[in-house]
Amino acid sequence: VGNRWEAWLHLVRRLMDVQLSQQPDQLYWKLTKNGVFSVKSMYLDVINSSVVPSSIHVWRVKVPLRIKVFMWFVHKQVILTKDNLAKRNWMGSSRCSFCDHNENIKHLFLDCPLAKILWRSIHIAFNINQPTSINMLFGTWLDGVDSDTARHIRVGVCALLWAVWNCRNDLVFNRSTNIHFLQVIFRATAFIRMWSLLTPTEARERLVTASTRWEMV
């Protein structure tokens, strides 16, 4: 009882110091001067802090900011896959759009039969084993790979996951009937070629060559 009373008195003292404003409340984003949220301000805050150390490479890879944010959401496992929608009381089917299993982030990007074929094609093209978990994908997966190669691979992984997500959404929202794994690869390599414009000329050529090699598997 004594501790509760002390806690209550402490709370009362804290509340007495609060000055209530007569103005209506409003949302204010503290990372911008005008108080309005922007992705850029969030991005700069993240890369200059240690909030997500295991996914720091995502913020440094040469892809559009939108893709970096998407990859960060994948890492945090908060993109709106059907299991996450169900947590928001969504009542739709929980089945994966590519197969008959329940959809979650790990299944969609790693365990789905379609995903396994895609990762197998990467293994054949570049002799890199598939990560076994989302944490591994953003953590130790590329340990031991030289930095230049790892940098290019990360661009490819961004393209792969973004292509899978786009194809999944085509099935869900655009009523596409089916998706062949080659469609996903071609879409991913198209993203790589487009994003290669963000890199210096020499690195751009290596990215384009790698994407062509992937298509030929």
Please describe what each predicted stretch is:
Residues 1-217:
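A helix-boundary/hinge signal
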